[in-house]
């Protein structure tokens, strides 16, 4: 049994297109054996970066597998930074399976795991970690605003800004360490150096804090604007959820307490991701299971971006307090004879559709105000946490009192630079790489 090759010496291959039947199937190969794989299957390597029509043959039997377009992409100017090859096959399942089996028999080649190509691009410096996250977000994007935000990340919007901040931090650190080295020189104006260092640290801190002061728009856009439907039992929450989402997502019944657990439905409202959440009716109950549902309802309300407080048109609002989050009062069942609209809120009928367009417009307006148009720099909690730490260290430098030990100033600057490096994946991120790339598609 031979020893396993180091990761950088292995060659990986995988379909880069969907797994179903299609007109064309694309197979990618990356690594030092990509060229030899073409030699064995395609009879040689075509001119670099030009598609060439070739007969693909099984290297073991010589049998023809397919007539395909092949491309030879020598590194390092490739997506992964390595030698690469692409095989554009006919999209039949049997054709693709036969070619993948043949590639598996090429020495040094093995099937790729999820995210393996993007991981190699990151490890070889073709993309930074924020751009890799942009790829993941683009794959997961369900709405136009999510697509726009993901493309900004993939284009390096955050990565370039953080790299510039990190470069400034490195310059400050170099100045602080130089001041330490020449501290014994009598002609050094230590007070002037300290003031200049504090001023530049404050400016860098303020720039980072400005990016953080965005109301968490980036994270909320990735996760979806959360709208919780809350109210007493039989207020029409499940019926309204089904009407707003256009499908029977929740069970509707006249029996109070039918909904016990939260039901989520993801929607696209004007290109914005919205998550509608049906919840258990709010009331005092001796039923242990229903009481747990009510407890979970209160938890969802506290974490919501918007609460739709549903009250039947002929009912009372009740004593519920939703002061912690934005609330929109909705008068339901306006089609009933007794449904004279009460004061305040939007009157809707999930049965006739009356008022639903106005309600959707109101939800979309709230989502647009909260999420923006995909222009946020910070899109993940990981970014926010690292940038907050960097700003904290810079704040200590900027506000250090006279006589503060210069060694501690330098250490704070060093920690700020390290925190900024974590955002782009330059330091301290090994433990989260597996989680990130495991969420990618095979062949990405």
From Swiss-Prot:
Annotated positions binding GTP: 234-239, 253-259, 278-281
UniProt-annotated binding residues for K(+): 234, 253, 255, 258
Domain TrmE-type G residue range list: 224-368
Alphabetical GO biological process terms: tRNA methylation; tRNA wobble uridine modification
Binding site for Mg(2+): 238, 259
Top-level taxon of the source organism: Bacteria
Main location: cytoplasm
GO MF annotation, one: GTP binding
GO cellular component: cytoplasm
Family matches, as PANTHER family: TRNA MODIFICATION GTPASE GTPBP3, TRNA MODIFICATION GTPASE GTPBP3, MITOCHONDRIAL
NCBIfam families: PRK05291.1-3, small_GTP
Subunit record text: Homodimer. Heterotetramer of two MnmE and two MnmG subunits.
UniProt-recorded name of the protein: tRNA modification GTPase MnmE
Species for this entry: Methylorubrum populi (strain ATCC BAA-705 / NCIMB 13946 / BJ001) (Methylobacterium populi)
Gene designation: mnmE
